[in-house]
Amino acid sequence: MKTKRVVSIILAALLIISVGITGFAANDEAIDGSNWMSAIDGEKRITAINIPGTHDSATVNADTNTVSRTQSLSIAGQLYAGARYFDIRLKKSGKSFYSVHSVVYNRKDVGLFGEKLTADDIIADFRAFLTKNPGETVLMLLKEESSRTGTDFYTGFYEKYIEPESDLWYVRNDHIPTLDECRGKIVILRYNSVDDERFDNTNSGISFNGYPYINNYKTKDFRFTQVYMTKPEDETREEPSSYAGLYVQDSFRLAPEKKWMAVSSFLANVKKPWWFSVCVTSSAAGSSPYYNALLINKKLMEYPFEKGRLYGIISVDFADAELCGRIYQSNDFTNEPNAATAAPEETIVYACLGEFIEKVRNVLFSVIALFVK
């Protein structure tokens, strides 16, 4: 009798375990690029989440296509692939904000002299995605490029986009927000300075004003700066409680082989959950950005990401769903995810010589890819 009872208990325990494992696996399988954040504990702070992102995010139709182009997906395409950190560079001209890469304009259309891409277009993609997927958030690194308007840049952006639609934005700078605080919102990571008389920690955006410019050839030049805000009080540490950390690897001048040394070393380093850890994998040295990205992304796909280990934000060139998935799947998923949603159909609009330029580009990229395999 006792033996039967013991066997029954063991079988019941095994059944519970198997159901739990099956449930977790099924839960994992229900996660994709549209809904992965909804499966993460909302009390987790955004600095404690592994987030795929994109470098120079809006360059899919940059003017000098093979030199300035660092992405092959539109903003919407990147969102549905799983990217949640976006490097958005804007030129202020009057009250307009144009998407640029250095002095080069990004376009809505493929080809020469297409319609210029603006912040309105980018924000529209973010808004549409978050409306369909309210369990997600978007981290937007907001940077002025090409123009130099000082504090007028953020003031103009705030008045045009944030103030009229305040519920869409997270712009506090007084603590590290939890995921629940950011769900359904665009989180501003502000690169530029602000007018201190107009803005304070309630509306200035999370300050990335100390983001480093790493213009050298060192493979282990990782920069740490302070982000002045209040750290969460529920964690014990020796550092002062008035700031969080910004920990960055962005040695863009390294050739791909050395760049990978920098990336892999940074990923292997222990990160603190109150740091904004940002690893930018792009390389501007040697060949084209596409060739460099093929080499680095291949190694990133092979990297042994550990489930539950903190890597932080990983910002890549030429992101796709497979690569983004490798990064976000390293998170611990504790919640039942929201239903996945499909990416909207995108219509390609060709400007002057657009089809010809696209064909030449595709042939060129195919040839480049042969040298990587």
Question: Where are the predicted features?
Answer:
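Positively charged n-region of N-terminal signal peptides that target proteins for export
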Residues: 1-9
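Hydrophobic core
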Residues: 11, 15-19
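Long, acidic (Asp/Glu-rich), low-complexity accessory segments flanking structured domains
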Residues: 20, 26-81, 94-132, 186, ...
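Conserved, mostly hydrophobic/aromatic
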Residues: 89, 140, 188, 314
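Metal-dependent phosphodiesterase/phospholipase catalytic core, i.e.
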Residues: 90-95, 100-173
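Surface-exposed intrinsically disordered loops and tails
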Residues: 108-113, 208, 238-241
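Glycine- and acidic-residue-rich phosphate-binding/metal-coordinating active-site segment common to enzymes
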Residues: 155-235
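C-terminal functional modules
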Residues: 213-340, 353-356, 360, 364, ...
